[in-house]
């Protein structure tokens, strides 16, 4: 079998969500909701898999105009960001790409063929994901909905 270079073109359906760990949820909600004007998800808009965490105040969800979800995860024990902008990337958690549930096994096989180390699949209430690093060390998630 020929070695592939990664996940096949067209397999990724788009960015599913962006997750950020935040130290001050109130300040972050003000920034993303008021300053940037993103729509805060409330009530039935909150993904069913996150309702409990939202109710507990541990997660707040916003939606960008193109439909991408921004998840803010409250992590009050985070150390302050480095004042040097070139060193402050550690507060971003991961970038998640959505795939169809029937493509998870293929994505895993392609990562193995490309010799890309990964963790998973990990099943959570929000779905199933595999995690690996990009060349700069950012965590990338390829995920599908809970039925995968």
Q: Where does each model-flagged region fall?
A:
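Vicinal oxygen chelate
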Residues: 1-11, 15-23, 58-65, 82-148
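A short, acidic/glycine-rich surface segment
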Residues: 2-5, 45-50, 77-83, 118
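Short consensus segments that form the blades of beta-propeller domains
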Residues: 9, 51-52, 86
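Core segments of cupin and vicinal oxygen chelate
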Residues: 21-69
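Conserved beta-strand in the GNAT
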Residues: 70-73, 141
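Acetyl-CoA-dependent GNAT
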Residues: 74-79, 145
């Amino acid at each position: 079998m020929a070695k592939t270079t990664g996940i096949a073109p067209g397999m990724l359906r788009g960015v599913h969500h962006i997750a950020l760990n935040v130290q001050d949820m109130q300040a972050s909600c003000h920034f993303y909701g008021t300053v940037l004007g993103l729509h805060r998800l409330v009530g039935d808009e909150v993904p069913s898999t996150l309702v409990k965490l939202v109710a507990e105040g541990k997660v707040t969800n916003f939606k960008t105009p193109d439909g991408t979800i921004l998840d803010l995860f409250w992590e009050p024990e985070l150390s302050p960001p480095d004042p040097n902008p070139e060193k402050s990337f550690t507060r971003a958690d991961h970038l998640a790409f959505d795939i169809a549930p029937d493509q998870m096994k293929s994505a895993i096989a392609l990562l193995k063929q490309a010799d890309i180390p990964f963790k998973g699949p990990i099943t959570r209430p929000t779905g199933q994901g595999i995690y690996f690093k990009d060349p700069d060390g950012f965590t990338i998630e390829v995920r599908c909905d809970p039925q995968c």
